Amino acid sequence: MQLCVALDLPSIEENLSLAKSLKNYDIWLKVGLRSYIRDGKEFLKQIKQINPNFHIFLDLKLYDIPNTMADAAEEIAKLGVEMFNIHASAGKEAMQSVMQRVQKFQNPPLVLAVTVLTSFNEEQFRSIYNDSIENKAKQFAKEAYEAGLDGVVCSVYESDLIKNITSDTFITLTPGIRPFGESAGDQKRVADINLAKEKKVDFIVVGRPIYQANNPAEVVEKILTNL
């Protein structure tokens, strides 16, 4: 299991300061919509300058018509990030288009499909999709697997179910991780490290418990020790 730290702070200075404090660790860093829209490609370069071995997960959740998604995926692949994501609900054709486009690169990034956002609870989800989170997450994951993607973004609770219907090597990345039982915040389906391990999760994304800590490096050290 690998750790991905969310760079979700209000300014580029704070995010870079956090990255610098973690430069000695073999970790992934997640750059989301807010940070990328505000700070752009330059921010990605600055992260790599701090530690060229940092792995970057660009969390933009592409969702559009197939050709537009493929065009955007090609531009992302040119950025040199190691992983990015798209929405599975865009459909299998869109997912296949993305994979065909990124596979042209010598070192293509990993591509993950978002199944069900961890901010949904069951009631909210049913009101939109008229189905359970588990059923829909499995359906989206199966389609992503068949489309040739590398894995999915899901909650801890769907991770092992998804591997059972796809492959043990099909990546599951889970947000909403509260390593040692911290407050859930705006996430609904959260879990700790032990449950993530039990459910065969490959990547855990941790944000607030790290960047709101007095000593983020200490928290990262503790998490890595428990992986």
UniProtKB/Swiss-Prot annotation:
The gene is pyrF. It is an enzyme of class 4 (lyase). Substrate binds at residues 8, 30, 59-68, 118, 178, 187, 207-208. The active site is at K61 (proton donor). It catalyses: orotidine 5'-phosphate + H(+) = UMP + CO2. Its EC number is 4.1.1.23. This is Orotidine 5'-phosphate decarboxylase. GO terms for biological process: 'de novo' pyrimidine nucleobase biosynthetic process; 'de novo' UMP biosynthetic process. Homodimer. It comes from the Bacteria. Belongs to the OMP decarboxylase family. Type 1 subfamily. Pfam families: OMPdecase (PF00215). Keywords: Decarboxylase, Lyase, Pyrimidine biosynthesis.
